[in-house]
Design a protein with these regions (language model features):
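Conserved core of the PLP fold type I
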Residues: 3, 7-153
Length: 154
């Protein structure tokens, strides 16, 4: 006898990689995004952040694993999500604080930092309802964030 849910998933197992379809549907409705872009898992954002940093440390995001580099830095918009900061601290990643402007991080500062510091590999950002302020990044801020080097991570 198979135990199935509405979606014909065997619910006796661990579930799908992207999370429960019903949770993803709710997330899509709340965030006004397509379900295909929504992940729903245990404390998903924190889990994803930790997994990504671990992958970059051991596999890299460009030419070499980050753990082979002398210094790894990530830009941290402030005020920001304390879990971003805790992950960086735990993994020995240098945090560079950049103030929020009302449209996201001050991109003039970000661009200057990235241009002059090869150790910077990315930026923590939550462009929609940024924690803890609720700030929403402007289209210009998002576009400017996407222009950096191949090993830049957002």
């Amino acid at each position: 006898m198979e135990i199935l849910f509405k979606t014909a998933l065997d619910i006796r197992n661990y579930g799908e990689i992207k999370g429960l379809p019903s949770a993803r549907k709710l997330g899509a409705q709340l965030l006004d995004y397509s379900e295909e872009f929504i992940l729903a898992s245990s404390n998903s954002s924190l889990t994803l952040m930790g997994n990504l940093l671990s992958a970059f440390l051991f596999n890299g995001s460009g030419d070499s694993p980050w753990n082979e580099l002398e210094t790894i830095s990530i830009i941290c918009p402030v005020p920001g999500y304390d879990r971003h900061f805790a992950l960086c601290e735990k993994l020995g990643i240098k945090m560079i604080k950049v103030p929020l402007t009302g449209d996201g991080p001050d991109m003039n500062i970000v661009e200057d930092l990235v241009k002059n510091d090869d150790s910077i590999k990315g930026i923590w950002c939550n462009p929609k309802h940024s924690n803890p302020t609720g700030e929403i990044y402007s289209q210009d801020t998002v576009k400017r964030n996407c222009q950096f080097a191949i090993d830049w991570r957002i």
